[in-house]
Amino acid sequence: DQWFWASVDYIYDHFDEFKLLLTSGENNTYQEFLHRIVELDNQCTMRYIQASRNDAISSGRLTPELGHLLSSAFYTGMFEVVIHDMPKDQAVEHIQRMRRFYTAGWRSIFFGDGGENH
């Protein structure tokens, strides 16, 4: 958790650089940046699942493709606070809510909740 919030601090400490990266006329730069973060996040998630012997993949609750989609959606949302020049205190509030939302979903994937068929 501390590492995550340190990354938010880093983004806001280097806000102008991130704003340039995320909104530059070269869309491929942002897409490549996002893709690299998502790939790293997805790889770490898959390693965690293997190391913890979680059955999310073997049960079919998670596929590498779904992991990629969820990670991409999260980081895209996280970077929207920069794209829209959101003040840090407001961004932190929104990101906390996003994390609670995604945490509930990941719990369902990791531990199953019986709602997979609904």
Segments predicted by a language model, with ranges:
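Amphipathic alpha-helical packing segments from all-alpha helical-bundle domains
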Residues: W3-D13, N28-N54, E65-S72
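Short, hydrophobic secondary-structure boundary micro-motifs
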Residues: K19-L22
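C-terminal peripheral helix-coil segments that are non-catalytic and often amphipathic
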Residues: D13, Q43-Q50, G67-H118
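Helix-rich interaction surfaces within compact, conserved domain-sized segments
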Residues: A56-R61
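Generic alpha-helical secondary-structure signal
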Residues: Q2-W3, H94
